[in-house]
Regions:
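RNA-binding accessory domains that recognize and position tRNA/RNA substrates
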Residues: 1-163
């Protein structure tokens, strides 16, 4: 576990012993697993601890996830209206992801595409991107080929984190 970062991203702290699944690669943090949220209104204001219900973080924002003891677990997108409150993007700190968001997601998409090409090189129809399995929560992309050989891509956005 890496230490707490010095950036300004909101921090979601899990309840005691709730980190095990995240450490094993599970991509979701449920609302009942969250102890509190630490954030500040702007760079000049003080950090404040609030319950999930009280916190004013805008849904769709990048947050960092920590153990109760303060060990860094990963970064994800928050949606307080969902039972799946945080969808993990990866084990990078928020500033690494936000430094070049476009490049970050292009890399994730290319990694997913290259993996599928290895397994489906002789197939004309398959799932290109499989959401959380590719660390792109809520995004499903499928490639289909019809009898005339035309290729179609079907895209589904299944969560706020993807929109």
């Amino acid at each position: 576990m890496t230490p707490m970062s010095m950036n300004n991203f909101p921090r979601v702290f899990l309840k005691n012993k709730e980190e095990k699944e995240i450490q094993q690669g599970f991509p979701w943090v449920f609302d009942n697993e969250i102890s509190h949220v630490k954030h500040r209104a702007d760079e000049k204001s003080e950090w404040k601890n609030e319950s999930l219900a009280e916190c004013s973080i805008e849904d769709g924002k990048l947050v960092e996830v920590y153990t109760k003891a303060g060990g860094f677990l990963g970064s994800g997108i928050i949606n307080k209206k969902s039972k799946i409150t945080v969808r993990i993007l990866g084990t990078e700190h928020g500033d690494e992801i936000s430094a070049d968001t476009k490049a970050y997601f292009e890399k994730k998409i290319l990694e997913a595409f290259n993996m599928r090409r290895m397994f489906y090189k002789d197939s004309d129809s398959y799932r290109l991107i499989f959401g959380e399995a590719d660390f792109i929560p809520g995004l499903i992309c499928e490639r289909f080929c019809d009898v005339k050989g035309r290729i179609f891509i079907v895209v589904q956005f299944l969560s706020l984190s993807c929109e």
